[in-house]
Amino acid sequence: MELNRRDFMKANAAAAAALAAGITLPVKNVYANDNSIKWDKAPCRFCGTGCSVLVGTQNGRMVASQGDPDAEVNRGLNCIKGYFLPKIIYGKDRLTSPMLRMKDGKYDKNGEFTPVSWDQAFTIMAEKFKKAIKEQGPNGVGMFTSGQSTIFEGVAKSKLFKAGLRSNNIDPNARHCMASAAVAFMRTFGMDEPMGCYDDIEKADAFVLWGSNMAEMHPILWSRISDRRLSKQDAKVAVLSTFEHRSFELADLPIVFKPQGDLAIMNYIANYLIQNNAIDQDFIQKHTKFKRGETDIGYGLRDNHPLEQAAKNAKTAGKMHDSSFEEFKQLVSEYTLDKAHELSGVPKDQLESLAKMYADPNLNIVSFWTMGFNQHVRGVWANHLIYNIHLLTGKISKPGCGPFSLTGQPSACGTAREVGTFIHRLPADLVVTNPEHVKTAEKLWKLPNGVIQTKVGLHAVAQDRALKDGKLNAYWVMCNNNMQCGPNINQERMPGWRDERNFIVVSDPYPTVSALSADLILPTAMWVEKEGAYGNAERRTQFWFQQVKAPGEAKSDLWQLVEFSKYFTTDEMWPAEVLAANPEYKGKTLFDVLYRNGQVDKFQVPADKAGYINDEADHFGFYLQKGLFEEYAEFGRGHGHDLASFETYHKARGLRWPVVDGKETLWRYREGYDPYVQAGEGVSFYGNKDKRAVILAVPYEPPAEAPDAEYDLWLSTGRVLEHWHSGSMTRRVPELHRSFPNNLVWMHPTDAQKRGLRHGDKVKVISRRGEMISHLDTRGRNKVPEGLIYTTFFDAGQLANKLTLDATDPISKETDFKKCAVKVVKA
């Protein structure tokens, strides 16, 4: 076999990734040149980077994968998880039939899981949903969904709940990872999602990572940063975190700060910029406006919690007051070098070096962040503060310069945010609380006025509380494992799931912790077992075709949503006055009015594509995915969210919106790059009516919980390279499981010695909410400072979220998984 340069580079990259994880990589995943294998493209199933892979199928099975050499994102490379993608769908315990808890031939909350037909499953499910709506109103039902759902599934579920069932109680697990970023985008720019793109990496002179371990969580992007750092003279990398991780290995400026200290650091930088005349006055005057945020806003805990009782402005947490540059200058002036050092624990010379990087007018700089910023009781503020720095310097919306929020899931942007599967959102940045936005949605969905409620539903943590309190009685969990991944399992989630008043449905391909805690399990098709679309962190929309069939009776989430709609009629779900005013809708099923409405069902599948598979089209009789997409795309066309045609995406390796006249947009808000910026404007933040971005003055405030005499350590949670989220897919890949089989607790050697502990010891981690048994690591990849431990949540045998606190950012309602107090003893 002849090996060309591209193959050589791919093989070496694959081998390097495997070596980092301690894995032997199958040769077929590197070269995959078997001519009997059929290849087609698909975006990776894992993180928000949006790598494209080539999927190899043979005899109806996925047998190989390789990085897509024609993809701009990853350029033929995959991370170690990507190289083992074929194995995620072939776990020995795949679910192949609906499973209902039964006893003596009928449903019983305490019964054993028993196989049932889809009709039996949907019949009992519809009965429970109708009962909950009759007793509680539309708010008695809810859905917790996902940033891993396809765009088509997102549209279908949003329509089913918000229009069909008239419940805005639908929220994605992106609430736990991207809500703070999304809210801050909207508050600052009037539009969601980053203004830049991955091309910034090759054009930047410096990179600053805030609470982001890109080396393990976004490894392909990290490989591009590494290449830039090593190939460009004087390129710099700064990494900020509460502990040292693998990204520190490349850092020129490695900074470890005290939990919550990032707020003080960023306010110090803003102060430094002003005091040293390193701000762009012209840019500020033309393109920004100043606001002051509400303070003392609480921590998103239950209303009767002492911290909420003491907070002065918990009810108005999101309020912003008109302000001025002088008032902003006065607030940040308090954040001197001494104060920033005191609050953050960072050496003064490091703080000054970081500030000078942002102050250098000749330095193109990109700020990246992920969960360290977002999973934060002041996550919205943290996002605002980094925008402040880029807006003050004018280092934004141009090649190699800008703030860049990275996503953790493959379609947290494309589905959760762009489609709008949050409790308050509709497609293309529309919101349910705006009556005009609601009218637009009803018109585009061909629905009568008055169907969609204008009140925000229950967010993720509030759903847990409502289930526990008996106010939410029918609940559908789709494409996530929230029993394992959500906070405060013991006190706030498990009680509601096992409450006799409630009926819990979980759609999943595997018997996860969530599935086994449910009353009804629906077996789900995975990834290329269905046709789909994702939207990644750089606004890139990517499509793929179905390539294999799901096993047994497993069905896609899209099929489940649309088929379930047949079990309800408008007479049962919609107000009598709406039907009286619109008699043509009376007596129809929700399937008729939502999906067979004359526009979703008007397309047929391509007749000229050999070997084409589409299980949904075969079942429903029309090209469901195309119909849903074209209906959805109308929301954004002409409004700065333009998408290309359906067929275009199947041909391309993704396009970055807005796509106008067939051309994608790399940098938004900048003349010459963004078609919505008019000639002569230079920069236009057109999401806001006045076309100005907000610079927000907010202070440092402490976390919800901190170590004390009894619980004397900080706990931070996160992930490792080898596993993704709850491990329900990656732990079923033998090679990945062997490389990192179980969760660990990383502790500083001095802290271990003080407690009479040693590396490898079995330990018990205890918080005010629960406890977890694990093993101690004082030598591994993560180097934690004294006073803090780090652990992960991929291990179903060690439920780390029994420890975490359900405190949230009061504005975004996103959970802080990075800061709570624990103690550690020998087990």
Swiss-Prot record:
<dbReference type="InterPro" id="IPR050123">
    <property type="entry name" value="Prok_molybdopt-oxidoreductase"/>
</dbReference>
<feature type="domain" description="4Fe-4S Mo/W bis-MGD-type">
    <location>
        <begin position="37"/>
        <end position="93"/>
    </location>
</feature>
<dbReference type="GO" id="GO:0042597">
    <property type="term" value="C:periplasmic space"/>
</dbReference>
<protein>
    <recommendedName>
        <fullName>Periplasmic nitrate reductase</fullName>
        <ecNumber>1.9.6.1</ecNumber>
    </recommendedName>
</protein>
<dbReference type="GO" id="GO:0016020">
    <property type="term" value="C:membrane"/>
</dbReference>
<dbReference type="InterPro" id="IPR019546">
    <property type="entry name" value="TAT_signal_bac_arc"/>
</dbReference>
<feature type="binding site">
    <location>
        <position position="818"/>
    </location>
    <ligand>
        <name>Mo-bis(molybdopterin guanine dinucleotide)</name>
    </ligand>
</feature>
<feature type="binding site">
    <location>
        <position position="530"/>
    </location>
    <ligand>
        <name>Mo-bis(molybdopterin guanine dinucleotide)</name>
    </ligand>
</feature>
<comment type="function">
    <text>Catalytic subunit of the periplasmic nitrate reductase complex NapAB. Receives electrons from NapB and catalyzes the reduction of nitrate to nitrite.</text>
</comment>
<dbReference type="GO" id="GO:0006777">
    <property type="term" value="P:Mo-molybdopterin cofactor biosynthetic process"/>
</dbReference>
<dbReference type="GO" id="GO:0051539">
    <property type="term" value="F:4 iron, 4 sulfur cluster binding"/>
</dbReference>
<keyword id="KW-0408">Iron</keyword>
<keyword id="KW-0560">Oxidoreductase</keyword>
<dbReference type="GO" id="GO:0030151">
    <property type="term" value="F:molybdenum ion binding"/>
</dbReference>
<keyword id="KW-0411">Iron-sulfur</keyword>
<feature type="binding site">
    <location>
        <begin position="507"/>
        <end position="508"/>
    </location>
    <ligand>
        <name>Mo-bis(molybdopterin guanine dinucleotide)</name>
    </ligand>
</feature>
<comment type="subunit">
    <text>Component of the periplasmic nitrate reductase NapAB complex composed of NapA and NapB.</text>
</comment>
<feature type="binding site">
    <location>
        <position position="481"/>
    </location>
    <ligand>
        <name>Mo-bis(molybdopterin guanine dinucleotide)</name>
    </ligand>
</feature>
<dbReference type="GO" id="GO:0042128">
    <property type="term" value="P:nitrate assimilation"/>
</dbReference>
<dbReference type="InterPro" id="IPR010051">
    <property type="entry name" value="Periplasm_NO3_reductase_lsu"/>
</dbReference>
<feature type="binding site">
    <location>
        <position position="793"/>
    </location>
    <ligand>
        <name>substrate</name>
    </ligand>
</feature>
<feature type="binding site">
    <location>
        <position position="51"/>
    </location>
    <ligand>
        <name>[4Fe-4S] cluster</name>
    </ligand>
</feature>
<keyword id="KW-0479">Metal-binding</keyword>
<keyword id="KW-0249">Electron transport</keyword>
<feature type="binding site">
    <location>
        <position position="47"/>
    </location>
    <ligand>
        <name>[4Fe-4S] cluster</name>
    </ligand>
</feature>
<feature type="binding site">
    <location>
        <begin position="717"/>
        <end position="726"/>
    </location>
    <ligand>
        <name>Mo-bis(molybdopterin guanine dinucleotide)</name>
    </ligand>
</feature>
<dbReference type="GO" id="GO:0005506">
    <property type="term" value="F:iron ion binding"/>
</dbReference>
<dbReference type="Pfam" id="PF00384">
    <property type="entry name" value="Molybdopterin"/>
</dbReference>
<feature type="binding site">
    <location>
        <position position="81"/>
    </location>
    <ligand>
        <name>Mo-bis(molybdopterin guanine dinucleotide)</name>
    </ligand>
</feature>
<comment type="similarity">
    <text>Belongs to the prokaryotic molybdopterin-containing oxidoreductase family. NasA/NapA/NarB subfamily.</text>
</comment>
<feature type="binding site">
    <location>
        <position position="177"/>
    </location>
    <ligand>
        <name>Mo-bis(molybdopterin guanine dinucleotide)</name>
    </ligand>
</feature>
<dbReference type="Pfam" id="PF04879">
    <property type="entry name" value="Molybdop_Fe4S4"/>
</dbReference>
<feature type="binding site">
    <location>
        <position position="557"/>
    </location>
    <ligand>
        <name>Mo-bis(molybdopterin guanine dinucleotide)</name>
    </ligand>
</feature>
<dbReference type="InterPro" id="IPR006656">
    <property type="entry name" value="Mopterin_OxRdtase"/>
</dbReference>
<feature type="binding site">
    <location>
        <position position="148"/>
    </location>
    <ligand>
        <name>Mo-bis(molybdopterin guanine dinucleotide)</name>
    </ligand>
</feature>
<dbReference type="InterPro" id="IPR009010">
    <property type="entry name" value="Asp_de-COase-like_dom_sf"/>
</dbReference>
<keyword id="KW-0732">Signal</keyword>
<dbReference type="InterPro" id="IPR006963">
    <property type="entry name" value="Mopterin_OxRdtase_4Fe-4S_dom"/>
</dbReference>
<feature type="binding site">
    <location>
        <begin position="210"/>
        <end position="217"/>
    </location>
    <ligand>
        <name>Mo-bis(molybdopterin guanine dinucleotide)</name>
    </ligand>
</feature>
<dbReference type="GO" id="GO:0009325">
    <property type="term" value="C:nitrate reductase complex"/>
</dbReference>
<dbReference type="InterPro" id="IPR006311">
    <property type="entry name" value="TAT_signal"/>
</dbReference>
<dbReference type="InterPro" id="IPR027467">
    <property type="entry name" value="MopterinOxRdtase_cofactor_BS"/>
</dbReference>
